[in-house]
Amino acid sequence: MTTLTRGNRPTLLRLASALLVGALLAFGARAATDDMHILIGSYTHDSDSPGILRLRFDHKTGQIDPKPVQTLASDNPSWLVLDEERGRLYATNENGPAHEDPVGRVSAWQLDSTGDHQLIGQNISLGDEPTHASLSHDGRYLFISNYGSRPNPGGSLAVMPLAEDGHPLPVTQMLAHQSSGVHPERQQSAHVHSAVPSPDGKRLLVSDLGADRVFVYRYDPRQAERPLQPDEPASIELPAGSGPRHLVFHPNGKHAYLALELSAQVASFDYTNGTLTRRQLLDLKEAGSDVRHSPGAIHTSADGRFLYVSDRGDYNHIIVFAIEADGTLREIQRRSSEGREPREFAITPDGRFMLIANQLSDELVVLRRDAGSGELGETLQTLPAGRPSDIKLLAPN
């Protein structure tokens, strides 16, 4: 045992000073990680938004700093795709016949930890209103959903190769579904709304709102010009007039969940090697209500215990489901989005907060979330933002 005497007090002081400095440095390192960055896509044609906002989010307090770290000028960058492995950001420029610039495009930026993003390049999507995109697991292609509001030619799926530096190259493959549905206004032709790679990356599942089908394609990058080919079976048929919008896989890869926009329903499936087997078809409309519902975004929690669906229209709620052990759903909560048209939302990696993009009320909303129960709690912040349409989270610096 060491005995402390007056003679070694200088040593003690030096030791205490060193410990204090170390503690301050450690505190500073922790404080630096308290902030994460969020990226906000938007519609610029009917708002004052400049394009994409990069904002700082304090994931200790749940507060967004209203002063942007950076703004990226871009036309209608409604959907964002992050490739954090390669440090890139892609956006669909959802232009179409109703806009001043009618040409749908995809834009790409190189991400910089300082917030100084550099535009890599752009290319056209060969279709109207590219509303969604996803990245192949190997990072070689973007799969672009051209919604195509005009019945002729309607929607399409575009396959866009990416150069080694991330530059979007000309589209090499176009896939159009010659189909329509029963809805007199929304289903006169195919309207591709999203395309999602399977958990193993070997297939692409394409939700076509106009066709009432989810089309399944095999992905083979060895066929560089035409990497997608119809699977067998080539599609999964859904109830007439249901309007499939977005599909999400459970983290275990064994289940999938689909938002049906036109019928205001959520479907749950078992998934095996490209085959979706439907387990449930759940109504979001409350019995006897004439309120207009319109499900939009759909995401699971990172732990796979809960599913969240944004319900727009006149309802404007987030609907929370518990995911049972067999993958089926049980509704547990309906929580106001505190705004109009909750087009997208994101849950922070620690599960403590949900960030909502309320498109038509021009605002971002932060809700507290209970990671244990999955329920959404108090409203922590409401922040003005022009026509927000998507939210993506960047890892803390």
List the predicted regions and their residue ranges.
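Bacterial N-terminal signal peptides
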Residues: 16-26
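Blade-loop segments of beta-propeller domains
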Residues: 66-137
